[in-house]
From Swiss-Prot:
Organism lineage: Eukaryota, Fungi, Dikarya, Ascomycota, Saccharomycotina
Organism whose genome encodes this protein: Saccharomyces cerevisiae (strain ATCC 204508 / S288c) (Baker's yeast)
Keyword set, alphabetical order: Centromere, Chromosome, Coiled coil, Kinetochore, Nucleus
Protein name, entry field: Outer kinetochore KNL1 complex subunit KRE28
One protein family per Pfam: Kre28
Keyword Nucleus appears in the UniProt entry: yes
Note, other: Present with 377 molecules/cell in log phase SD medium.
InterPro entries xrefs: Kre28
């Protein structure tokens, strides 16, 4: 009797500790999630209010009941966010086009027109003006395509990261719910054991005198055997509850380990992705400055084309009669799949097998090299720079 009561009390203490620990951890996770949501909404509201200071197309709601004008509460109506975002996107497209036009004109006047030898243009139909205008349009389209591709890539990465974060958050919430359900099952089992123990104690106390005063030894043996069977049943119940408590400890440790591992993995992935993105942007900037911005009309690259659906880049080398075609194996993690060097010979275009084989052996399926480095190396070797 005393041993059984002590065991039940120990179980209750352990279950209470586990339940409190899970409740505290669950509340902390929910508070962190709510805090992140509030911070996100605050940043969105602050951004919209900042835009509203200089633009009239965003109209945040204000609490007009307050007498203090400067202290009025400002918030954003979520129902109008979709329409306002569309208007904002249209304005951003116009601003982007205007910026590209101004930037193109700036480079055009800076690197094309001479300050000492002004062009003698009769009208807009002048052949020289038409040719320069076409060149400006081509450059503008190339720059726009590259920037849009980068924007779409970054948007896709943001969406993927947000989706993964949401899945991990849902998984943590589900684990806490499952742990809470297991705790409730343990309490039910413990209460059942307590009721059975109390009932057995009452039966044993009520039948004690009858068993001792009975002259029938067979009845005494039968009662003893019955009680022994009940004790075996209670022992099995005790073993089952002990096993469930052990499983609950494992669930708790698993939740803690997954939480710590999730934080480490998220931090590592973010650092790796940011480092790789910065490296790609730096290589693209250097390549663009070297072959387009700094040289201007004297650039060695002509007819630069990007085929996004095919994962292919193609361009020509000025005054060298070379056409270079580079195919990628994967757009998400681009690796060189094939490099083809074509050479113009008379009226025909033939494949330079030796040069193609050389560059393929050097760069094919190389994950450590960026496509801009490959293009720069090919141009340098073919032009002997």
């Amino acid at each position: 009797m005393d041993t059984g009561s002590a065991s039940i009390k120990d179980y209750e203490t352990v279950l209470t500790d586990i339940e409190d620990s899970i409740a505290v951890s669950s509340e902390e996770v929910l508070n962190n999630q709510e805090l992140r949501l509030k911070n996100t909404l605050h940043e969105i509201t602050s951004s919209i209010l900042a835009i509203n200071e200089e633009n009239k197309f965003v109209n945040p709601l204000r609490n007009d009941e307050s007498l203090d004008v400067e202290g009025k509460e400002v918030f954003v109506n979520p129902k109008i966010l979709s329409a306002k975002i569309k208007e904002f996107n249209k304005l951003m497209e116009l601003l982007k086009l205007t910026y590209l036009e101004q930037e193109t004109l700036d480079y055009f006047f800076r690197f094309t027109l001479s300050s000492t030898k002004p062009l003698q243009l009769d009208s807009e139909k002048d052949p020289q003006f038409v040719k320069l205008n076409e060149r400006v349009n081509d450059l503008k389209e190339e720059i726009s395509n590259v920037q849009e591709s980068k924007i779409e890539q970054i948007k896709a990465e943001i969406q993927e990261t947000g989706h993964n974060f949401a899945e991990r958050q849902d998984l943590i919430n589900e684990l806490y719910l499952e742990a809470t359900g297991d705790i409730e099952n343990c309490w039910d089992s413990l209460n059942e054991l307590k009721n059975l123990t109390n009932k057995e104690d009452k039966n044993m106390m009520g039948e004690k005198d009858t068993i001792l005063n009975s002259s029938d030894s067979d009845d005494f043996v039968e009662e003893t055997y019955t009680n022994w069977q009940k004790l075996l049943f209670l022992q099995k119940q005790n073993q089952r509850l002990t096993k469930e408590l052990k499983e609950m400890h494992e669930v708790k440790n698993q939740i803690i380990r997954k939480g710590e591992q999730s934080k480490k993995e998220d931090s590592g992935h973010l650092m790796a992705n940011e480092s790789e993105l910065c490296q790609s942007i730096n290589l693209l900037t250097k390549f663009w400055e070297k072959h387009f911005l700094l040289k201007g009309s004297k650039t060695t690259i002509l007819n630069f084309e990007i085929f996004t659906q095919l994962g292919k880049v193609q361009f020509e080398i000025k005054d060298m009669q070379y056409i270079i075609a580079i195919s990628l194996s994967d757009l998400k993690r681009p690796m060189i799949k094939d490099i083809t060097i074509l050479q113009k010979a008379g009226g025909n275009i033939v494949t330079d097998i030796e040069a193609s084989s050389k560059f393929n052996n050097k760069y094919r399926n190389n994950t450590k090299v960026q496509i801009f480095e490959v293009m720069d190396d090919i141009i340098s070797e073919l032009t002997n720079e």
